[in-house]
Amino acid sequence: MTGRFGRPSERCHTVQVRSEPDPSGSEAELLSQYLDYQRETVLAKTDGLDQEQMARPHPPSALTLGGLLYHLALVEENWLEVRFLGLPDRQPWAGVDWEADPDWEFRTSAELEPEQLRQRYREACDRSRLVVAQASGLDQLSVKPLRGGRRFSLRWILLHLIEETARHAGHADFLREAIDGSVGE
């Protein structure tokens, strides 16, 4: 495995095989493939970590890898199931008073085992893939409006999910390195 700048690194953690996006794919295929690549990156950053490591913050930030994973599960479900399809929130999100505790998913992730967090995220991603596959196309608008009554196209939602997941994959890079010195893609 290589580290920064293509040099071999003894500090690289085991990375699951990630699917490279097909450069000849359609717009819809590329958006889905780039999102999957980022999802796989985030999951790889949690490989081999125990509950204490997943819940360990690295000051001055309060972020944890477990919190990021739980947050990304919420983001997947919220954008594609709740906003795009108009479905009600699933548990545990449905019972949360977000006004009183806006960082609930970050705070409560420490109570869950690493595999529970990974499984929740994988299941949310699987359901998201199904929503995208069953949509009429990238121009299909969300059922639930937001921001002054505006509705979101599936294209916008996928781009937003790529941006959000990639941003948190970058956070996960730093968090993982702070935990055990591992670096990698």
What is each of the regions a protein language model found here?
Residues R4-S9, T14, R18-P21, G25-D47, ...:
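Short, contiguous alpha-helical
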